[in-house]
Amino acid sequence: ERNHYHTPNDSPANLDPRTVQHHGDNLFPLALWLANSDLSAAHTGRVVYAGVYGLWAQWPQSATAILLGVAALLLIAAGLRWEAGAAMLVLHATLVPGLLLALGGLLVHQCFELLERTNGVTVGWPAHPWTFRIVIWSAMLLPALVLGPLFQQRVPFGARLLGAWWFLWLLSFGVFLFAPDAAPALLIAVLPTALLLAVLAWLPLPPAWRDLLSSLTLAASALFLYAATLLGATQGLHVLPAIWPWVGLFAVTAVAFVRGPGSGLAALVGILVLPLGMLLSINLPLYSEQRPQHLSVWYLQEADAPAARLHLQAAGDLPPTMAGMSGFTDRRENLFPWSDEPRPHQAEAVSAELPAPSLLVEEDRPVAGGRRLRLRLRSERDAAMLRLVLPAAAGDWTGDVEGVPINRGPVDGSETQEFTQLRVHGVQGRDVRITLEVESTGPLTAWLADYSHTLPAIAEGLRMARPATAVPQHWGDTAVVYREVTF
């Protein structure tokens, strides 16, 4: 559960070997493969890899082009014996898959836009993820279920089946050209399917038996559903554009099997299941103790200011226990003078009068192109981190921290490029000596802030009001004291 990442739930008790950090789905089969391998054998060269139903598959990167060629030859061999027709084959290898993916993708995004408007947020890891999976899967499969009978009446089964896998081969080839290391994600399904279709085409089987055994190709394309499920679990539903195409690829391969008297019933079921998934996604709770809302309490204090501010950094609407607390509004304002990302859920508070961080200029002398500054920084409240935010006038500065060379780096993406920052972690009560060479010859006005994870008493009520279905994330609960400095 990556919902637990950087939260109090990020513990061994919640460890799942399938989703360790971001690539646990590959880590577990890799560990099994290594345990059964001869590790004394030398290995050179780049390899590409993929997890296949819990098994580890890898081959030299240079072999991908050969495997693509083998898959193409097998599909050609299958087409020689399978009734298809060149025109219909081309149609089902290009236009039909594109139509199914476009219709399904449009439907998915429209459904999730409606859900976001109703729920107020798209939750990456909701309490009941299966309801949202119902929406994604049914929306992507619905065009295939509705249009499948229409294709059956006009296009031979062989053209529908081979066309779908030629589309996947073309897609694999395109991925190989632009991102060769990503091609195995498709090739692990295309190659065994091409082999199966070629074998079925050349075996002396009755057409009915051949068509029946061809349904085994769905076992290969089901790998795409596996990929969609893993992406939703490890990256969250907010990466929706990376999830639904995998379900769409399964739909492209499955449309050939939408036929017979039951196809109309299947389409009707799909039409009914989609609104059912929508209703469940709207009415069931978005958060639970196992999959909580990410909500951190921030205390912000500008030195010598008459009042401080409280900020609730939350994904989505505030919990009822906190939404009614006085002073918080949905009006968006910048958190800091140097930031340029207005955020809601802020309120004025009585200042706890925490001591501000200190800065002492130990040296200030001119150098070629600017000035050399030696600064001594300190958190007067033993905070964990110091941040020095420099204005654009400092130019492309360089320097060192305790003798370690540093270069100018950009501030967070949430802050304007008019400022650059220097963050020093693990400070606590120590003096930090910084040497900077700036391009400015005149006075510089900067900001100095320190960050701790101990909230003052003024914020204790908010922390206590946070329900069990909400937890702090990333920085967690944070107290920031900042001041303007000139040197």
Locations of regions flagged by a protein language model:
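Short, surface-exposed, charge-dense and proline/glycine-enriched linear segments
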Residues: H4-D10, F28-L30, L34, I66-R81, ...
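Generic structural signal for short, solvent-exposed loop/turn connectors between secondary structure elements
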Residues: D38-H43, R81-A86, V258-G262, A368, ...
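Soluble extramembrane regions of membrane proteins in the secretory/endomembrane system
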Residues: E1-Q58, L388, A392, V404, ...
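Hydrophobic transmembrane alpha-helical segments in integral membrane proteins
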Residues: A57-V70, R133
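Structured alpha-helical bundle/scaffold domains in large eukaryotic membrane-trafficking regulators
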Residues: A42-H43, T64, N119
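Extracytosolic and intramembrane catalytic regions of membrane-associated proteins
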Residues: W298-F487
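Sequence-level detector for tyrosine residue identity
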Residues: Y5, Y49, Y53-W56, Y226, ...
